[in-house]
């Protein structure tokens, strides 16, 4: 796509065929300006991958021939609706959070296998992710598959060390904390020692995240799509993944890290809900320095009373859900609750103590 002659042309968009269609997975693509989000999306839009992918750009920037061709119609007027590309993909530019664009896309959803939603460089991907849980009408048509954060290998550490006013979270650290996958891009521009430091810093913030390293945003699409980060299809895989997560040691952003612990037994769902709500909504719990703990991402596999299947806990900011997985607790398998918290000012010792105290009332732990 380097040659402007190769830019896609506008073609009419046909309405979706009649008949039932499956839910469409949505992946949120986030990252700082210049990290390589647009390059990644351009690659996906133009690569032959036999998938019908709709890409929703938050806004078109200045620069590449592809962007210019997308933003201008055949009549030379600004084009902010839909553009279908030769490989079957679709592109859209919107000026809002993408909600209207997705609703419009649903009218044509029979044409697509996947939706990629770009956020602006400083946007909080958690706020965008939340709309998929809150909007029941959207929820029937789409589901959130994962959050992908693109990081500039050369300037990533600089963004992470940027000082913020008291009480504000570093945006780059937040984007990593929320990510299911991070793509460290432009690795050819840094030495291995710098790359190692960035890799360690990413891992210290989010011990759950998968890390890919690349140049020019070239990645295997199978690594980016179908992450199933928010569903319960594979409870066994999540259980094994959580077993490998360790409490991290803070690096650059000393207030942002991953905490994990496990507590044996089965707990009351009602008391568990109270604990989670006090943590996420009320921000009741404070660390040893007296600072309120802020959880940005929460995951867990839990054993609830009167339930024979393992229950998955997912949380983003103030929103959370508990959902049964297909996996049963085996007869001889010890029942336990394993939780992973990613956020700011977290103290694992205090969190575990508060969890046990909250769910231990009224003989709730069996």
From Swiss-Prot:
Binding residues annotated for GTP, in chain numbering: 31-38, 92-96, 185-188
InterPro entries reported for this sequence: CobW-likC_sf, CobW-like_C, CobW/HypB/UreG_nucleotide-bd, P-loop_NTPase, Zinc-reg_GTPase_activator
EC number(s) on file: 3.6.5.-
Chain residues that bind Zn(2+): 89, 91-92
Disruption phenotype: Mutant fishes survive to adulthood under zinc-replete conditions, but display moderate developmental delay, characterized by reduced height at anterior anal fin, standard length and snout to vent length at 6 days post fertilization (dpf). They show impaired zinc homeostasis and cells show impaired activity of metap1.
Pfam families membership: cobW, CobW_C
Catalytic activity as recorded in UniProt: GTP + H2O = GDP + phosphate + H(+)
CDD domains linked: CobW-like
Annotated GO CC locations: cytoplasm; nucleus
Molecular function via GO: GTP binding; GTPase activity; metal ion binding; zinc chaperone activity
Domain CobW C-terminal span(s) in chain numbering: 258-357
Motif (psi-PxLVp motif): 5-12
Chief place of localization: nucleus
Span(s) of short sequence motif CXCC motif: 89-92
Origin superkingdom: Eukaryota
GO biological process terms on file: intracellular zinc ion homeostasis
Disulfide pairings: none
Cellular compartments annotated: Nucleus
Keyword vocabulary terms for this entry: Chaperone, GTP-binding, Hydrolase, Metal-binding, Nucleotide-binding, Nucleus, Zinc
Keyword Zinc included in the entry's annotation: yes
Family, similarity comment: Belongs to the SIMIBI class G3E GTPase family. ZNG1 subfamily.
Function: Zinc chaperone that directly transfers zinc cofactor to target metalloproteins, thereby activating them. Catalyzes zinc insertion into the active site of methionine aminopeptidase METAP1, which function to cleave the initiator methionine from polypeptides during or after protein translation. Mechanistically, the N-terminal psi-PxLVp motif binds to the C6H2-type zinc finger of inactive form of METAP1.
Protein name: Zinc-regulated GTPase metalloprotein activator 1
Lineage: Eukaryota, Metazoa, Chordata, Craniata, Vertebrata
